[in-house]
C-alpha cells in the first residue's frame, strides 16, 4: 500500500482503527529451543533492534516524503536517533506538559493538521536459516500511533502508546539485508484517551525486538495460581494456546531453581469440553498441584518457574516458553482486600515512568533504583499511573516484592464531561482493546493483585463492559476504578482520590465523604483503598500521619497510593550553564499546567525530598511503644506489622539522650512472628541530672543485606520523652551592673563596661542598626518582624495570573498586603535598669490606609553581651490566617564555619503539621543542606521545636522554629526555577514563634488543617541572642 493511500485512510482519526494486522495480545514470549534453556532463562530467540536508526521529522503526515518507505530510498541526509527515545529530547519538536487540558483543540476523533510526524528507518540482516522460522517484530511502546513497512510493503498500524504492537514479518523478509520504515504520528484519536498528568512526548520510546519462533509454536500461556481453603497447598491452572496440529502435545513442569518441583504434565488439545458444541483444538488445559509451596507476597517474594513446552505428536521438542510464578490467592473477603487469607495494608505510591534526560524511556537500572528506594522507604505497593508500564517492571516487582495495581492506558480528563467518550459506543472498541490487551500481556505476574480500568474518565458503559469482561476472564483478581465517584458498580474496591480523613470534600457531581464515613455507609461492604492521596507537590504532606492513624484503627481502611513518586522535571541548562529542572511552559508550550508535574516524593534524579522521611516513618512495618518507665528501666512493646514474615533479620538499637546527647545505648535481637508483639526491657544505667531533658530513641535495623538494602539499613524509628524525677536546682543569681546607656543624635547607644559589646538603635526607624563585638559586626540586617513566607505550591493552589482563585492562601495574603505592609516606627525609647538596659520599639504596619498589625519589641541587654528580645504582636481582626509569626535578620557569612548546629527537631526539614518523623536531639548540618532545593522555589528548611541554635557568629536560645538560607524571601518568591536563585554573601536567619502548616491533602484547595492555621489576634514570644564564643 502506497503512503498516499495510508494518508487518505487517516487511521489516526478513526477510533475503530486500533490495531491493523497486529497479532493477538498475549503474555510475553521468548521461544526457547530447549527445556533447560527455558528453565534457566537463557538463549531466548529474541534479537534487540534498539540502537541508532535514521530519522527525519515532518510537520504533518501529509508532508512525509512518499519514497521513504522504499528500500532504495537514500536516507543518508537524515539524522540519527537513538531507539528507544522520545524525539523531543533528541533535538526535535518540543515537550508539552499538561495535567487536564488537551494540548490541541478538542474535537474527537480529529486531531490538528499541524501534527508532527517522525519517520524512522533501519536495516536488519537475516540468513536463510532465520527465514525457516517465523519472524515477529515487537514494538513495546510507540507514542502515539504508527504505520510500519518492511522492504517497501505496508505491514500494519497500531496505537495505544503503552502496550506492545506485534507484527508477523515473515512474508515480507528476504535473506540478506531488509529495510524497516516506521511513520510515527504525534497526535491521533488515541491521544484523546491518553490525557494523563505527564509530559506529551513522542516516538519509539520502548524496546524494539525481533522474535524468532518455529512455525508450530506456543502462542500464549495463562497461569493462574491458587491456594486451597486452608491457604496451605497450592495449584497452578495453566491454559496454553498453540499454533500446531491438534495431535501436538503440551509438556508442563514446575521448577524451583534447577530442581523440578512437579512431575511433567502432558496433555493435548480437546482435553476439556467447553460447551455442547465441544472443545478447542488449539487450547490445552492443565493443572499442577504442589504441597505446601513457599507462598509469594511482597514481604516474601518466593518465585518458581513454569516451563511450558510444545511437542509434536511423537514427543519431539519444538519450543518452550517459561514464566516466573508465585503461589498466592487474592480475595475481597469480609470487607477487606486479602492475600493468602490475610488482610493487606497498602503502603502505596503512584509512579510515572519518568527520566530527567530520557523522558519516558526507562532502563532496567532506573527501575531497580526506584524499587529499592520504595522498599527502603517502606512502600509495599505501586500503581502504574496511569498506563501499563515497561514489561520488565513487572518482572522486577515479582522479584523484589511489590504489590502492583496495573492500570489501563485510559484517561479523558480534559473532556467535558469526563465520561463523554466513556459513554460513547463509537469508542467502546478502543476502550476494550486497551484494557484487554493489558490484561493479556500482564496476566501471569504474581505481583499484580489489582486491575485498574484507567483513570479520570468519568463512568460510562465502556467501564461496565471492561469490568464484566475482566470478572469473566480473570476472576482471580479484583478490579478498581475511581471514575464516577469511586464506588460505582465497576469497582470491587472503594478507591477515592484525595478524600480526607474527617472532613467532606464538597463536590456536586461525585461524593467525597471522609474515609471513616465512607466505610460506614449503609449496605457498603467493600474495602477502601485511596487510589490517590497526600498530594506531594513541593513542600507538602502535612497531616500525613492522620491517614495512617486511621488506617491502623479501622480494618477496612486499607491504605492508599500517594500522589506521586517522582518530580517530572526535565534536565535543562540556561545560557550561563546553570542546570535546572524544566516544567510546563519552559519549552514554549503555551498550553501547559506549569509546575503541576512537580509533585513527587523524590527529585527527578531520585534524591529524596524531606517529605519521604515522614512517609517512611508513618508506613513503618515495625512499631515500638513505651508502655512503662521507672527509675531503673523502660518497658517497650515492639509490634511486627509484617503480615507474612517474622523479624528474623531485624535488631532493635536504642539510645538514651541527655539534652540531645547520647549517654547510654544498646541493642537486642527481635524474634517476633508476623502480626505479633515482643516486650523489650531496657535497664537505665545513668544518673539523671536536674533540669535535663531525656529521650529514648529506637531504631529497627537490618542485620543482613537484602536485595534492596544494605546491612544496617534503618527501617523504622521512634522517640520517647522520658520523665526525669531528679530535684530541680536553684538558678545561680549574679549581681551585675547595667551596661552603659547614652544617646547620640537620633541614635540610642548601649555598651558594656569593657566596650566589647556595643549596640545601636536608630530612634526614627526603631531598628537595631548595629551590634558590634570586639569591633566586628554581628549583623548585616537588623532583626525585623516577619509575617511572610515564600509561597508553597500548596499556598498557590490553582491560582495563575489568568485564573485567580480568591480562596488560595497566596491570594488571600496578597489581598491583605502581607509581605507589602509599610512599617512605621511609633516610638523608640530606652531606660537603664539596675542590671540591664531596656530598649522598646513600637511598630505599626499599614496597608490600604489601615493599620494591619502593631508589634512591640522589648530588648533587654546585660553586661555579659546577651540580648533578650520579647515581641508582642497584635493583628487586625479581618486578616486571613498568617503564614508565620516571627523575625528575620541577616548575619555575615563566615569564611571558616558554615555549619549549623541546633538542639531541637531534625535532622531533616520539618513543619508543624509534618514532624512525626523528626526527632529531638543535637543536630549539625552544613549551611547548604539547610535549604531544600525544591524545583519551584519556595519556603523550605524549617526546623521545629528548637531550644538553641548556633549559626554563623550567633547563638540563639528559646523555644522557636527556625530556618537559615543564603536566599532572601524576595528571591524565593520571584524565582520560578532554582537557576534563577543567586547565593548571597550573608545568612538569612528566620526565627519563628509560630509557622503555618504546609497542608497536602491536595494542592488545589487551602488544605492546611485548622489546628495548624495561625488565627489568633495576639502573640507573644521571646528569644535570646548572644555572640558565639562569648
Swiss-Prot record:
Q: Name one GO cellular component term.
A: beta-galactosidase complex
Quaternary state and partners of this protein?
Homotetramer.
Keywords, alphabetical: Glycosidase, Hydrolase, Magnesium, Metal-binding, Sodium
Q: Which PANTHER family match?
A: BETA-GALACTOSIDASE (PTHR46323:SF2)
Its UniProt entry gives the catalysed reaction(s) as: Hydrolysis of terminal non-reducing beta-D-galactose residues in beta-D-galactosides
Q: Which organism is it from?
A: Photobacterium profundum (strain SS9)
Positions of substrate binding: 99, 197, 456, 532-535, 599, 1004
Cofactor comment text: Binds 2 magnesium ions per monomer.
Name of the gene: lacZ
> Where is Mg(2+) 1 annotated to bind?
411, 413, 456
Q: Which SMART domains match?
A: Bgal_small_N
The UniProt record gives the binding positions of Na(+) as 197, 596, 599
Lineage top rank: taxon: Bacteria
Q: Which residues of this protein are catalytic?
A: 456 (proton donor), 532 (nucleophile)
From its record, what is one biological process in GO terms?
Answer: lactose catabolic process
Q: Keyword Hydrolase, does the record have it? A: yes
User: Any idea which positions bind Mg(2+) 2?
Assistant: 592
Name the UniProt record assigns to this protein: Beta-galactosidase
Which cofactors are required for activity?
Mg(2+); Na(+)
UniProt cross-references to SUPFAM superfamilies, sorted A to Z:
(Trans)glycosidases (SSF51445), beta-Galactosidase/glucuronidase domain (SSF49303), Galactose mutarotase-like (SSF74650), Galactose-binding domain-like (SSF49785)
> What family is reported?
Belongs to the glycosyl hydrolase 2 family.
Task: List residue numbers at the site (Transition state stabilizer).
Answer: 352, 386
Give a GO molecular function annotation for the protein.
carbohydrate binding
Amino acid at each position: 500500500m502506497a503512503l498516499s493511500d495510508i494518508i487518505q485512510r487517516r487511521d489516526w482519526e478513526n477510533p475503530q482503527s486500533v490495531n491493523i494486522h497486529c497479532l493477538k495480545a498475549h503474555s510475553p514470549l521468548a521461544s526457547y529451543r530447549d527445556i533447560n534453556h527455558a528453565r534457566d532463562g537463557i538463549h531466548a530467540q529474541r534479537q534487540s533492534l534498539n540502537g541508532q536508526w535514521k530519522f527525519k521529522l515532518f510537520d504533518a503526515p501529509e508532508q512525509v516524503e512518499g519514497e521513504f518507505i522504499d528500500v532504495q530510498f537514500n536516507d543518508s541526509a537524515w539524522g540519527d536517533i537513538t531507539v528507544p527515545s522520545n524525539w523531543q529530547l533528541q533535538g526535535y519538536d518540543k515537550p508539552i506538559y499538561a495535567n487536564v487540558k488537551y494540548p490541541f483543540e478538542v474535537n474527537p476523533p480529529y486531531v490538528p493538521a499541524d501534527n508532527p510526524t517522525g519517520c524512522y528507518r533501519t536495516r536488519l540482516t537475516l540468513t536463510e536459516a532465520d527465514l525457516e522460522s517465523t519472524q515477529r517484530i515487537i514494538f513495546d511502546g510507540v507514542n502515539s500511533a504508527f504505520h510500519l513497512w518492511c522492504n517497501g510493503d505496508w505491514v500494519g498500524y497500531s496505537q495505544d502508546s503503552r502496550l506492545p504492537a506485534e507484527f508477523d514479518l515473515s512474508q515480507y523478509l528476504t535473506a540478506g539485508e531488509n529495510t524497516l520504515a516506521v511513520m510515527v504520528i504525534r497526535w491521533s484519536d488515541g491521544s484523546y484517551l491518553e490525557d494523563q498528568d505527564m509530559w506529551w512526548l513522542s516516538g519509539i520510546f520502548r524496546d524494539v525486538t525481533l522474535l524468532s519462533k518455529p512455525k508450530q509454536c506456543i502462542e500464549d500461556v495463562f497461569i493462574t495460581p491458587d491456594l486451597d481453603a486452608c491457604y496451605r497447598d497450592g495449584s497452578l491452572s495453566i491454559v496454553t494456546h498453540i499454533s500446531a496440529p491438534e495431535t501436538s502435545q503440551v509438556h508442563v513442569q514446575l521448577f524451583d531453581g534447577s530442581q523440578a518441583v512437579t512431575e511433567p504434565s502432558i496433555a493435548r488439545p480437546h482435553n476439556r469440553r467447553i460447551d455442547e458444541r465441544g472443545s478447542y483444538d488449539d487450547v490445552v488445559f492443565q493443572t499442577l498441584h504442589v504441597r505446601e509451596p513457599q507462598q509469594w507476597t511482597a514481604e516474601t517474594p518466593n518465585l518458581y518457574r513454569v516451563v511450558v513446552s510444545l511437542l509434536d505428536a511423537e514427543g519431539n521438542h519444538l519450543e518452550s516458553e517459561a514464566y516466573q510464578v508465585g503461589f498466592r490467592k487474592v480475595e475481597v473477603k469480609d470487607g477487606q482486600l486479602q492475600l493468602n487469607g490475610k488482610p493487606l495494608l497498602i503502603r502505596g505510591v503512584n509512579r510515572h515512568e519518568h527520566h530527567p534526560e530520557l523522558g519516558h524511556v526507562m532502563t532496567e537500572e532506573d527501575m531497580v533504583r526506584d524499587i529499592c528506594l520504595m522498599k527502603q522507604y517502606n512502600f509495599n505497593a505501586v500503581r502504574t499511573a496511569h498506563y501499563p508500564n515497561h514489561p520488565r517492571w513487572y518482572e522486577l516487582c515479582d522479584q523484589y516484592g511489590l504489590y502492583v495495581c496495573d492500570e489501563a492506558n485510559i484517561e479523558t480528563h480534559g473532556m467535558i464531561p469526563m465520561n463523554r467518550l466513556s459513554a460513547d459506543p463509537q469508542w467502546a472498541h478502543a476502550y476494550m482493546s486497551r484494557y484487554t490487551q493489558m490484561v493479556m500481556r500482564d496476566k501471569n505476574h504474581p505481583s499484580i493483585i489489582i486491575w485498574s480500568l484507567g483513570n479520570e474518565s468519568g463512568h460510562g458503559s465502556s467501564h461496565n463492559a471492561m469490568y464484566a469482561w475482566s470478572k469473566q476472564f480473570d476472576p482471580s483478581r479484583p478490579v478498581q476504578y475511581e471514575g464516577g465517584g469511586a464506588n460505582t458498580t465497576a469497582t470491587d474496591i472503594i478507591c477515592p482520590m484525595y478524600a480526607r480523613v474527617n472532613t467532606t470534600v464538597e463536590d456536586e457531581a461525585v461524593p467525597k465523604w471522609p474515609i471513616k464515613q465512607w466505610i460506614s455507609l449503609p449496605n457498603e461492604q467493600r474495602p477502601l483503598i485511596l487510589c490517590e492521596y497526600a498530594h506531594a507537590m513541593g513542600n507538602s504532606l502535612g497531616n500525613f500521619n492522620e491517614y495512617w492513624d486511621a488506617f491502623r484503627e479501622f480494618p477496612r481502611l486499607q491504605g492508599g497510593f500517594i500522589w506521586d513518586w517522582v518530580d517530572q522535571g526535565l534536565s535543562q541548562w540556561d545560557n550561563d550553564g546553570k542546570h535546572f529542572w524544566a516544567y510546563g511552559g519552559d519549552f514554549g508550550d503555551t498550553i501547559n499546567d506549569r509546575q503541576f508535574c512537580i509533585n513527587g516524593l523524590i527529585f527527578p534524579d531520585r534524591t529524596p525530598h524531606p517529605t519521604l522521611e515522614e512517609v517512611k516513618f508513618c508506613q513503618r512495618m515495625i512499631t515500638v511503644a513505651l508502655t512503662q518507665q521507672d527509675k531503673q528501666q523502660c518497658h517497650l512493646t515492639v509490634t511486627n506489622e509484617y503480615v507474612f514474615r517474622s523479624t528474623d533479620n531485624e535488631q532493635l538499637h536504642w539510645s538514651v539522650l541527655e539534652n540531645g546527647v547520647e549517654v547510654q545505648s544498646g541493642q537486642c535481637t527481635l524474634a517476633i512472628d508476623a502480626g505479633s508483639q515482643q516486650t523489650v526491657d531496657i535497664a537505665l544505667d545513668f544518673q539523671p541530672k536536674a533540669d535535663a531533658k531525656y529521650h529514648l530513641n529506637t531504631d529497627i535495623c537490618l542485620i543482613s543485606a537484602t536485595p534492596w538494602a544494605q546491612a544496617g539499613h534503618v527501617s523504622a524509628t521512634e522517640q520517647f520523652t522520658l520523665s526525669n524525677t531528679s530535684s530541680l536546682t536553684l538558678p545561680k543569681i549574679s549581681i551585675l551592673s547595667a551596661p552603659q546607656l547614652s544617646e547620640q543624635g537620633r541614635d540610642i547607644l548601649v555598651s558594656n563596661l569593657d566596650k566589647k559589646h556595643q549596640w545601636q538603635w536608630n530612634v526614627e526607624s526603631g531598628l537595631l542598626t548595629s551590634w558590634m563585638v570586639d569591633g566586628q559586626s554581628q549583623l548585616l540586617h537588623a532583626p525585623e518582624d516577619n509575617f511572610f513566607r515564600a509561597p508553597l505550591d500548596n499556598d498557590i493552589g490553582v491560582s495563575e495570573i489568568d485564573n485567580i482563585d480568591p480562596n488560595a492562601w497566596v491570594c488571600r495574603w496578597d489581598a491583605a498586603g502581607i509581605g507589602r505592609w509599610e512599617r512605621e516606627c511609633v516610638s523608640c525609647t530606652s531606660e537603664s535598669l539596675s542590671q540591664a538596659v531596656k530598649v522598646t520599639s513600637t511598630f505599626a504596619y499599614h496597608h490600604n490606609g489601615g493599620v494591619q498589625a502593631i508589634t512591640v519589641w522589648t530588648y533587654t541587654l546585660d553586661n555579659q553581651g546577651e540580648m533578650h528580645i520579647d515581641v508582642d504582636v497584635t493583628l487586625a481582626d479581618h486578616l486571613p490566617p498568617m503564614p508565620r509569626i516571627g523575625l528575620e535578620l541577616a548575619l555575615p557569612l563566615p569564611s571558616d564555619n558554615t555549619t549549623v548546629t541546633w538542639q531541637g527537631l531534625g535532622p531533616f526539614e520539618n513543619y508543624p503539621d509534618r514532624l512525626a518523623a523528626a526527632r529531638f536531639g543535637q543536630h549539625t548540618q552544613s549551611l547548604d543542606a539547610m535549604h531544600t532545593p525544591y524545583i519551584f522555589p519556595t519556603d523550605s528548611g524549617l526546623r521545629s521545636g528548637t531550644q538553641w541554635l548556633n549559626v554563623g557568629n550567633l547563638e540563639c536560645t528559646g523555644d522557636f522554629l527556625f530556618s537559615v538560607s543564603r536566599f532572601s524571601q524576595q528571591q524565593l518568591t520571584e524565582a520560578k526555577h532554582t537557576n534563577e536563585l543567586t547565593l548571597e554573601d550573608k545568612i538569612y536567619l528566620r526565627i519563628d514563634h509560630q509557622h503555618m502548616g504546609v497542608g497536602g491533602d491536595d494542592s488545589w484547595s487551602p488544605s492546611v488543617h485548622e489546628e495548624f492555621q495561625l488565627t489568633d489576634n495576639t502573640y507573644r514570644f521571646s528569644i535570646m541572642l548572644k555572640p558565639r564564643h562569648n
